[in-house]
Amino acid sequence: MTTKELFDRICRKRSFLCVGLDTDVKKIPPHLLNEDDPILAFNKAIIDATAEYCVAFKPNMAFYESMGSFGAHSFEKTIEYIRERYPDQFIIADAKRGDIGNTSDMYARSFFEHLKVDALTVSPYMGEDSISPFLSYAGKFTVLLALTSNKGSQDFQMMRDADGEYLFERVIRISQTWDNAGQLMYVVGATQASMLKDIREIVPDAFLLVPGVGAQGGSLEDVAEYGMNAHCGLLVNASRSIIYADNTEGFAAKAAGEAAAMQRQMEIALRAKGLI
C-alpha cells in the first residue's frame, strides 16, 4: 500500500480512525469465555462492528503474547480475519520491535512476510542499522516511536541538546535522511498535541500514528488542527474507549456507536481542511 492509497481510503470513508485491538481476556464480556478462542471471538465481533467507520486496525502484540502460544495464535488469526474479510483495511502490528541488524531482519520477515501486516511499530533507540531491515520492504511502513503519550516521555524524549533541539525532534529529523524514509511513519501521542505544529515543520508529509484519544484524554480537535496536512497525514488510534465501551452481549453494537461518533468528528475535520 502507498500513502496515496491510504489517503484515498481516508477520503472515501471520511475517516482516519484506527481501532486498537488491545484485547485483554480479563476485560472481555463474560459470555465469550465459553468460546474455543475467546480473544478471537471478541476481535471478530469488534472488527465486524467497526470496520465501516475506520481505515486501520492496530492489534497490540503484548496483549496476545501475555497468553503464550494460545495468544500468538489468536493474534495471527485476527490478522488473517481482517485480511480476508476487510482487505482494504490498513493493519498495524503494534509490537515496538528494534534490535541489531540480524535480529531486525528476522522481525521484519516475521511481520512483513509471514503475517503480511502493512506496518509495524519500531523503537529507534539503536539507530539506522536497526531500522533499515524494516525499510527494505517496499510497500510496508515502519512506525517509529517519536513522542509518546505517557508521562515517562519527559524522561528522555523531551531532553534538549545545546542547540535547544528535543531528542524526539532529532530522532525524526535524522530518520528522514535514511534510505527509503518515505516508508516511515511516526508515533506522536494525542496528549502531546501542542507539539504537532513543530513536528509538522520537520515532517510535513509523513503520516503520524496518534494514540491517546479517548480513554487517555487526548483531543481529536487539537490533533486535527495542528497535525493534519494536505493528505490528512493522520491515523488516530482509539482502543479502550471503543472496544471496552460495554461488557454485555451488546458490546459490539456499543463499540460501533463509539467508532461511528469518532468517524463523524473526523469527517467534520476533513471537511474543514477541504480534503473531502
Curated annotation (Swiss-Prot):
GO terms of biological process kind: 'de novo' pyrimidine nucleobase biosynthetic process; 'de novo' UMP biosynthetic process
EC annotation from Swiss-Prot or TrEMBL: 4.1.1.23
Positions annotated as active site in the UniProt record: K96
InterPro entries: Aldolase_TIM (IPR013785), OMPdecase_type-2 (IPR011995), OMPdeCOase_dom (IPR001754), RibuloseP-bd_barrel (IPR011060)
Pathway field: Pyrimidine metabolism; UMP biosynthesis via de novo pathway; UMP from orotate: step 2/2
Gene3D superfamilies for the chain: Aldolase class I
Residues passing through the membrane, by range: none
Domain of life: Bacteria
Keywords: Decarboxylase, Lyase, Pyrimidine biosynthesis
Catalytic activity annotation: orotidine 5'-phosphate + H(+) = UMP + CO2
GO molecular function, one term: orotidine-5'-phosphate decarboxylase activity
Annotated SMART domains: OMPdecase
PANTHER family for the chain: OROTIDINE 5'-PHOSPHATE DECARBOXYLASE
Family: Belongs to the OMP decarboxylase family. Type 2 subfamily.
Protein name (record): Orotidine 5'-phosphate decarboxylase
